[in-house]
Amino acid sequence: MAMTFHVDIVSAEESIYSGTAQMVVAPAEGGEVGILPRHSQYIAQLKPGEVRVKVSDSGEEHSIFISGGLLEVQPHVVTVLADTAVRAKDLDEAEAKEAMRRAEEALSDRKADFDYAKAQAELIEAAARLRMIEKLRRHTR
């Protein structure tokens, strides 16, 4: 039997996943990180993207989109504190495209009270959602 550890993925709205895993892969600011059992203590800021939780040797895996957050790793527990989190199967492509359109429009139509950083962050998040939707589409064919 493979070694496992406990994983919690939570957002302000709800707990998305709580259970055991063999591996977690998350989009840290410095690059994608893979966490295995007995990993040394680690904390990282997360960027928008996919968190993958490998549950078993059979290949069962959960994919969760996060808009950013924090990753805390202890030897036997991994916690993802996400700004927002959505199960991959629940992502809405039309909503993501609309969010991207609005962010691109805001970036091109700057006004005096324009918040460039916010518009850029919204664009990055929308693009990450669309990449994840496209990845899911390729894997379900």
UniProtKB/Swiss-Prot annotation:
The keyword Acetylation does not apply. It is a peripheral membrane protein. GO terms for molecular function: ATP binding; proton-transporting ATP synthase activity, rotational mechanism. It is found in: Cell inner membrane. Pfam families: ATP-synt_DE, ATP-synt_DE_N. Keywords: ATP synthesis, Cell inner membrane, Cell membrane, CF(1), Hydrogen ion transport, Ion transport, Membrane, Transport. GO terms for cellular component: plasma membrane; proton-transporting ATP synthase complex. InterPro entries: ATP_F1_dsu/esu_C_sf (IPR036794), ATP_synth_F1_dsu/esu (IPR001469), ATP_synth_F1_dsu/esu_N (IPR020546), ATP_synth_F1_esu_C (IPR020547), ATPsynth_dsu/esu_N (IPR036771). Coiled coil: none annotated. NCBIfam families: ATP_synt_epsi (TIGR01216), PRK00571.1-4 (NF001847). Belongs to the ATPase epsilon chain family. F-type ATPases have 2 components, CF(1) - the catalytic core - and CF(0) - the membrane proton channel. CF(1) has five subunits: alpha(3), beta(3), gamma(1), delta(1), epsilon(1). CF(0) has three main subunits: a, b and c. Produces ATP from ADP in the presence of a proton gradient across the membrane. This is ATP synthase epsilon chain. It comes from Thioalkalivibrio sulfidiphilus (strain HL-EbGR7). The gene is atpC.
